[in-house]
Amino acid sequence: MGDMGDPPKKKRLISLCVGCGNQIHDQYILRVSPDLEWHAACLKCAECNQYLDETCTCFVRDGKTYCKRDYIRLYGIKCAKCSIGFSKNDFVMRARAKVYHIECFRCVACSRQLIPGDEFALREDGLFCRADHDVVERASLGAGDPLSPLHPARPLQMAAEPISARQPALRPHVHKQPEKTTRVRTVLNEKQLHTLRTCYAANPRPDALMKEQLVEMTGLSPRVIRVWFQNKRCKDKKRSIMMKQLQQQQPNDKTNIQGMTGTPMVAASPERHDGGLQANPVEVQSYQPPWKVLSDFALQSDIDQPAFQQLVNFSEGGPGSNSTGSEVASMSSQLPDTPNSMVASPIEA
């Protein structure tokens, strides 16, 4: 008989609180997935001491529990410019490992907002647009130094194909030079550039209908728009080839300017922020120990009923119990509904 009494003792589990280490005798046990159990009074945020229960989102990191607000504040991804976190509906701009709000994705020198398709340099002290980067580079390297990969070989403004015109050539020579045909560039304003770049970021090869819409929106001629897209595609292709060659020659090569490290990049389209949390929220379950279930059932039902006797046998888990899965299911249908979910894991009273 002594051997027959051992198996039930082995099956009984003792719930220990992760917070205080003591055994849990409370009416309710808070379980943090997958197998952490707490007193209701011990499950609190490690920062603000807010009590956590099944109605809250709980995060566990390095053995400490946090509410959602404090976890995002401490460990969530923040904007590299304003150091403010992101909501799940925010669109963000990325530059290597740094993430920015769309409004914060600006040149630190001129405060111009960078849009998809813009060229910029990522340095230790922030983002620099192409123009300001070249100004600092020329001042640092001097006018006689050879052009670096980031130096423009043409005007910084995005220019379309020039149209023909006649004007006298001004040369500082003593002898008079004859007039000749020169090419005048069509300089685009900021609004026109923004429209063209936005369209290019969405589709580098627009169809005829889209080009007609761009003509109406920008006031430029179809030929200017067509050539602008051709030049832009050619320029991006050359830059891509150049960057690949530089990466192959010197994988860790970066442009060092006045002690600052600048990495040439091209702004991509904004993307939705996915939260960036380094841990997933865990579920907190509240359940009653089996002894509490038996007590409530005994107060509301006749203890001589077969269902109650079967529930007692199932809780004891003795070897003489013949309860099956179907009998347990039939017993559960006779139990009164309770506001809390019950977990069928036995606990030592």
From Swiss-Prot:
- What is one GO cellular-component annotation here? nucleus
Q: Report biased composition (Polar residues) as residue ranges.
A: 321-343
Q: List, alphabetically, the CDD domains matched.
A: homeodomain, LIM1_Isl, LIM2_Isl
Give an example GO molecular function: cis-regulatory region sequence-specific DNA binding
Pfam assignment, any one:
Homeodomain
Segments of the chain annotated as binding DNA = 181-240
SMART domains for this protein: HOX, LIM
Q: What is its main location?
A: nucleus
Keyword annotations of the record: Activator, Developmental protein, Differentiation, DNA-binding, Homeobox, LIM domain, Metal-binding, Nucleus, Repeat, Transcription, Transcription regulation, Zinc
GO BP, one annotated term:
cell population proliferation
Q: Which PANTHER family match?
A: INSULIN GENE ENHANCER PROTEIN, INSULIN GENE ENHANCER PROTEIN ISL-1
UniProt-recorded name of the protein: Insulin gene enhancer protein ISL-1
